[in-house]
Amino acid sequence: MRIAYILTSLGIGGAEKQVLALADRMSARGHTVLLLALRARQQQEWPAQVDVVYLNMQKTPVDLVAGALRARRALGAFKPDVVHSHTYPANMLARMMGLCGAAPRVISTIHNVYEGGRLRMLTYRWTDLLVCHTTAVSTAAAERFIRLKAVPREKCGVLTNGIDTGEFTPDTPRREAMRTQLGAGNDFIWLAAGRITEAKDYPNLIRAFEQVQDTMHETQLWIAGETAAGSRSSDREEPGCFRLKASSSEHDRVRLLGLRRDMPTLLDAADGFVLSSAWEGMPLVIGEAMSMEKPVVATDVGGVRELLGDTGSIVRAKDSAALAAAMLEAMRRPAAGRAMAGRAARQRILRYFSIDSKAAEWEKLYQSLL
């Protein structure tokens, strides 16, 4: 098959990483693959192993039209059998390409429970005739879009994210080296990861960690993620006061690590992973932590429950006391018990969420449309 993937950018993010992993797997399975990125090439990107066309679509009307024309030319030359788009901007462009005949079969994928307000939901509904199928990365996301009438139930399915279990495999020497580099000592290290945005609700995590510190002092919190430019904030403290708190003497055990490309190594070095999000789709990093055999404490958002099953702790969103209690419970568990739970988590990923099994599912869906 000839498969074209359309995504907003190749920037460092979970959805982008998932699309690139899928593109690589499809290429390895003998298909011809092309990537179209709406934005221009960025300074920080995931590396692509397949051909990429950058559409350079900025927010001005001229740039948007020029980018759409570039997309039409690229798809016209490539002649795809299937066009698979990811997240709202790319989904709308793919549908436009279907309207003009450049995309014979379009699949749209929704990567979050929340992809915008009422107008976006209406545009999903109005353009649904231009797609063959819509998928969501979690049941929670699919049900919300169906409930809002953005997608009809008969054309919507769930196909979860996949984890590269080869990349995310525990490695003891790597763990020790990173712990030494970052000054972990004998502390229990909690790792959180993701852009510093409203959705991730880091103020909730900081409040929870304060409570953990009141009880167990020999612990650190590492946060890997960049500030997303132009992100909304529901809390006046985010991200400015959050940075101030993290750098103050009161919170000298909170480390802001910035943008990182070495998540397998960071997860190796950590003793547990914590997610404090207010909303999510299907957080890839939780699956990665499970693949690394780490205990996971997470808020009950998006597809978290689908991923974790009974292998981790799930608490209410925006409840720092519950989050702290679950973190403390994980820390108090004997090391042997944590190790056993970690192995069970990895087995769950291997059985249900490996990227290779997901690639096979996608391939089957593509073939069903031909």
Please describe what each predicted stretch is.
Residues 5-66, 229:
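N-terminal strand-loop element at the rim of the active site
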Residues 16-21, 188-211, 221, 321:
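A conserved mid-protein helix/loop that constitutes part of the nucleotide-sugar donor-binding site
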Residues 36, 286, 295-298:
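Short hydrophobic beta-strand element within catalytic cores of glycosyltransferases
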Residues 107-137, 143, 149:
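A conserved, positively charged/aromatic
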Residues 169-184, 238-242, 336:
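A short helix/loop element that forms part of the nucleotide-sugar donor recognition site in Leloir-type
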Residues 234-258:
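Nucleotide-activated donor-binding/catalytic signature segment of Leloir-type glycosyltransferases, i.e.
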Residues 259, 278:
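Aromatic "clamp/platform" in nucleotide-sugar-dependent glycosyltransferases that forms part
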Residues 310-320, 329-335:
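Conserved acidic donor-binding segment of nucleotide-sugar-dependent glycosyltransferases
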